[in-house]
């Protein structure tokens, strides 16, 4: 354990503190061997943490996955075993003993397919070898096609209905097993399983149309917008001395209007630096324009979704989607958003008044002018996030060391570097970490693929390649066999048995979780040294590690409710909460290897006035998402996405609507998060409350970490999230998760600077 001692707070801004003694408390950390190993692993240009190994294996320790063709063979083997298990479940109605195993076998069937599908998803996005990536794509498409057949399999649905209708069988199910059964049942119901054949075929057709329209919508969202025509005289006085001067010279030399494309560096410079309002107005309108075809694609997508919902007896796509979420109904979502608007609008208006005063001074006006949409970046230029106190440069290795120390304080869990065997990882940059619990030993693995390279997917991502589940009760022999396919069956069995462990002080054998983190940081080099992260990169790592820790601790008997397999409007809570820890100087002191750095007590007290404006804009977008997936899409013959956006902006917004704009065609989350865009705001509100009420006072206190671990993390998706949150906050009034509970969460101000849109 790291030694702790309390010291008196000294208020003088000139006082210099040791890095290990930030503000109220100091945590003197003697660097352990694991601390030094983890720093060396990520900061050394040659990845110094290496042990000699003569053992050769395949991806993730699966000896058969040593070449792309073997992966395709594994997919074939998986299909054979999945069909055998499907047939077994279908025969269960003739045996009570088999009926008792239906929920377990459905979960096994799901895991059998998902463990290969999730691996394929990673390989096709991260593997540098084109042959592997192609194989990954093939396997993904092949198994997803079979999965879609199972999702609409009437026989499986009828067997599950038989189980849930038998009270004596239901009594034998644990709460976790019953929750798993309900998830399968709801998924079947959403797939029009109980409709006549013709209507089921229509469901399949509409689902296919939605995928096609969704892809087209996303292509349109990312398509370049036409340029804005900027007159030379509008460039006079531009504040940017580099690119701005070049644009002014170009305008003077050509004596013609400049054509500036939205999203370009020139466009960004104009929005932030042009003192004349007109070029900013033109750029804004150009950036938020749409063609009739782009609008038509979105509206066809929304109407097709609405038709799908009506087909299965729901009044709207939002009603269909929210059934199994914390919110439960669109009305509850609007209750939450309405309360959140009431909480946030005063802060947004106060911020706008600050910007209005800046605009008044800029133009020398006698009264406060209106802030327009194109004024935001000029009067409040976007600033990168900053730590709460000045810090020395933070390297990738020190961040992972700090994460390991934080997890040790909170949960008794540490990250331990270990060598990957030859063939186990897809690139030499990938590093392997064991996740070690002080009582239970090894509980999972994290593979960190953190450095940029050609062909690698961009951005940060978290992949749960394999979920946790209990395996000693599987009864593989009961699945039967198939003459002529013995080798394939054995191949899949061997694949499944890797990563299984007996957990000390816990019944049974468990398949341990396996997580991959993908980022694109600069690789350390001999010339430049270790990779130093910007603060937003540190926040991203903490966010993704929140997901990873949920996967590690949420070790359930059923994979369908393990780790991050939980409600969409709950899954971001652990990751957003992790970002809050970065607001604590006490936590930041864990980044110091030996206590050799010093820093000033004076913190970063600058408050971005635009933060509340941006949060309010997110609330408006979440409201728009609900409107776009409401019954009005079909009930109103004149439904127009552009009109709805204008009406919402006029009635609820704080910045005037701009005519001739149609931002909705670039709102890409409408496809991936249709009717659930509120989720991120919802989890931000809960995370803010949890931080304030549970962690802020003493963020490294083990008792607090254990409470969070036991009341939230360990359940994964196997318990009602409302019960978890109400227990954690000692707020019994939330347990019902009704309309009033949603309103109550909406009344919690989102007290953070951590919620960056797009980090999921």
Curated annotation (Swiss-Prot):
Keyword set, alphabetical order: Hydrolase, Metal-binding, Metalloprotease, Mitochondrion, Protease, Transit peptide, Zinc
Cellular component GO terms held in the UniProt record: mitochondrial matrix
InterPro entries in the cross-refs: M3A_MIP (IPR033851), MetalloPept_cat_dom_sf (IPR024079), Neurolysin/TOP_dom2 (IPR024077), Pept_M3A_M3B (IPR045090), Pept_M3A_M3B_dom (IPR001567)
Transit peptide: 1-19
Names of the cofactor(s): Zn(2+)
Catalytic residue positions: 544
PANTHER family for this protein: MITOCHONDRIAL INTERMEDIATE PEPTIDASE, PROTEASE M3 THIMET OLIGOPEPTIDASE-RELATED
Family under the similarity heading: Belongs to the peptidase M3 family.
Protein name per its UniProtKB record: Mitochondrial intermediate peptidase
């Amino acid at each position: 354990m790291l030694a702790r001692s309390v010291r008196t707070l000294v208020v003088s801004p000139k006082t210099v503190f040791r890095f290990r003694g930030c503000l109220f408390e100091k945590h003197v950390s003697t660097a352990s061997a694991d601390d030094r190993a983890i720093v060396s692993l990520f900061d050394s240009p040659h990845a110094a943490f290496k042990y000699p190994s003569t053992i050769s294996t395949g991806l993730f320790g699966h000896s058969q996955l040593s070449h792309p063709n073997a992966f395709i063979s594994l997919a074939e083997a998986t299909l054979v075993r999945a069909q055998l298990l499907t047939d077994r479940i279908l025969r269960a109605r003739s045996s009570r003993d088999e009926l008792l195993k239906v929920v377990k076998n459905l979960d096994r069937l799901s895991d059998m397919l998902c463990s290969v599908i999730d691996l394929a998803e990673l390989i096709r996005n991260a593997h540098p070898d084109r042959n592997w990536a192609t194989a990954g794509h093939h396997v993904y498409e092949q198994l997803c096609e079979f999965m879609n057949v199972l999702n609409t399999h009437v026989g499986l649905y009828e067997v599950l209905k038989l189980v849930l209708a038998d009270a004596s069988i239901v009594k034998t199910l644990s709460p976790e097993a019953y929750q798993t059964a309900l998830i399968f049942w709801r998924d079947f119901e959403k797939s029009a399983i109980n409709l006549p054949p013709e209507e089921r075929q229509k469901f399949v057709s509409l689902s296919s149309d939605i995928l096609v329209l969704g892809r087209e919508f996303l292509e349109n969202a990312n398509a370049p917008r036409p340029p804005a025509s900027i007159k030379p005289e509008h460039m006079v006085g531009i504040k940017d001395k580099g690119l701005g001067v070049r644009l002014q010279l170009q305008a003077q030399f050509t004596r013609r209007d400049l054509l500036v494309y939205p999203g370009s560096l020139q466009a960004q410079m104009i929005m932030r630096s042009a003192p004349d309002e007109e070029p900013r107005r033109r750029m804004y309108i150009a950036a938020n324009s749409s063609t009739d075809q782009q609008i038509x694609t979105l509206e066809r997508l929304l109407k097709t979704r609405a038709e799908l919902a009506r087909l299965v007896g729901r009044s709207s796509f939002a009603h269909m989607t929210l059934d199994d979420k914390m919110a439960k109904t669109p009305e509850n979502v609007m209750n939450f958003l309405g309360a959140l608007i009431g909480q946030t609008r005063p802060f947004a208006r106060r911020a706008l008044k600050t910007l209005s005063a800046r605009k008044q001074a800029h133009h020398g006006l006698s009264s406060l002018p209106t802030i327009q949409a194109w004024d935001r970046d000029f009067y409040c230029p976007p600033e990168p996030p900053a730590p709460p106190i000045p810090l020395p440069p933070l390297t990738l290795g020190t961040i992972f060391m700090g994460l390991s120390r934080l997890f040790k304080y909170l949960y008794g869990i540490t990250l331990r570097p270990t060598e990957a065997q030859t063939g186990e990882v897809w690139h030499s940059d990938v590093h392997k970490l064991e996740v070690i619990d002080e009582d239970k030993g090894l509980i999972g693995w994290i593979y960190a693929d953190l450095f940029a390279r050609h062909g690698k997917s961009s951005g940060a991502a978290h992949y749960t390649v394999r979920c946790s589940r209990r395996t000693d009760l599987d009864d593989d022999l009961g699945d039967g066999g198939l003459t002529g396919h013995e080798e394939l069956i054995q191949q899949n069995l061997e694949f499944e048995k890797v990563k299984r462990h007996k957990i000390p002080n816990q019944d049974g054998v468990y398949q341990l979780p396996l997580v991959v983190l993908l980022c694109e940081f600069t690789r350390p080099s001999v010339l430049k040294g270790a990779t130093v992260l910007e603060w937003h990169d540190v926040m991203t790592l903490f966010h993704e590690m929140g997901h990873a820790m949920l996967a590690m601790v949420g070790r359930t008997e059923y994979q369908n409710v393990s780790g991050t397999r939980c409600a969409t409007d709950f899954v971001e809570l652990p990751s957003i909460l992790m970002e809050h820890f970065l607001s604590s100087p006490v936590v930041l002191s864990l980044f110091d290897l030996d206590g050799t750095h010093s820093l000033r007590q004076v913190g970063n007290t600058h408050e971005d006035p635009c933060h509340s404006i941006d949060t309010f804009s997110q609330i408006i977008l979440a409201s728009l998402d609900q409107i776009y997936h409401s019954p009005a899409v079909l009930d109103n013959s004149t439904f127009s996405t552009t009109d709805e956006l204008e009406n919402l902006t006029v009635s609820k917004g704080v910045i005037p609507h701009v005519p001739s704009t149609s931002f909705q065609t670039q709102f890409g989350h409408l496809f991936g998060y249709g009717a659930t865009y509120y989720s991120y705001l919802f989890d931000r509100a809960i995370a803010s409350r949890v931080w304030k009420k549970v962690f802020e006072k003493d963020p490294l206190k083990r008792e607090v970490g254990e409470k969070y671990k036991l009341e939230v993390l360990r359940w994964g998706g196997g318990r009602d999230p409302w019960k978890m949150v109400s227990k954690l906050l000692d707020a019994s009034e939330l347990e019902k998760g009704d309309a009033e509970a949603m309103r109550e969460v909406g009344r919690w101000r989102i007290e953070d600077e951590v919620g960056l849109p797009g980090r999921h």
